[in-house]
Amino acid sequence: MVKRHVLVALTVGWVTGLCCLSSIAATDNHPNIVIIVADDLGWADVSFHGDQIKTPNLKRLVDEGAELSRFYVCPVCSPTRAGLMTGRYPIRYGLMRAVVPPWRKGGLDPAEVTLPEVLAKAGYHHRGIFGKWHLGHSHVKYHPLRRG
């Protein structure tokens, strides 16, 4: 009996949340921004750059959106992610060689302005980053929830 009440309560909460989100989305005039970063995906690994493996959904995203084809990346994820988040070269903030593991002290300097912070100032109230962080774990000031 208790499981049923919990299930009903969770369902009501979930539906209420969806209704609230849809009403918020209907009043938001900002265009959606979706950035996809894929590890180990080469330029020619997608069908719209000539590969034989079909990637129709990625092609549709490029056709209906924008493809950024001039960029700088590092061979490991932390410097690349930090560059994307700040718009700066990794050597400028000292994250240029390796992944920032959870036990390493330090991370992306909290004084660095990040993309989510810029979006917040531009009126984007609903922002999300999904996937790995790897820009500092040892102290709360480096956590992603503190970064806009």
Annotate each PLM feature.
Residues K3, A9-L10, W14-G148:
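Formylglycine-dependent sulfatase
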